[in-house]
């Protein structure tokens, strides 16, 4: 069975938290929370809605969990952003090349986790998404 896990940046201090996604309406406002177990209590913290990302179900070569909007570097030097693809027929994750449209990832980059490592995410490292900056 696959893990359903989300990550988001806390509103109060900007730290990343992982857990279950809780979406609540308060007097017309929609607020997002990440819930997690602390000792024996369920704790929830409010997160910035735009930063909520879903775990794609694999880890990189360093056993770090890969979430949508993470920026990964492949064994072959390609810099890619992990994206969630949603259509009427299916939902899945994919990677898009950031450096050049001609350097799109191939199937070896995506399906062999030892070929990937997380170098950041699009929220903490927006320059990597907007430019051809290399790591």
Model regions and ranges:
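Secondary-structure transition motif
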Residues: 1-135
């Amino acid at each position: 069975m696959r893990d359903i896990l989300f990550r988001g940046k806390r509103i109060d201090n900007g730290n990343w938290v992982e857990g279950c996604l809780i979406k609540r309406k308060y007097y017309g406002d929609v607020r997002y929370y990440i819930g997690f177990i602390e000792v024996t209590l369920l704790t929830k913290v409010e997160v910035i809605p735009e930063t909520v990302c879903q775990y794609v179900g694999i880890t990189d070569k360093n056993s770090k969990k890969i979430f949508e909007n993470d920026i990964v570097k492949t064994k072959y030097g390609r810099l890619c952003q992990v994206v969630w693809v949603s259509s009427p027929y299916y939902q899945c994750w994919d990677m898009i090349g950031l450096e050049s449209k001609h350097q799109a990832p191939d199937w070896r980059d995506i399906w062999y986790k030892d070929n990937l490592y997380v170098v950041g995410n699009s929220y903490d490292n927006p320059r990597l998404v907007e430019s051809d900056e290399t790591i």
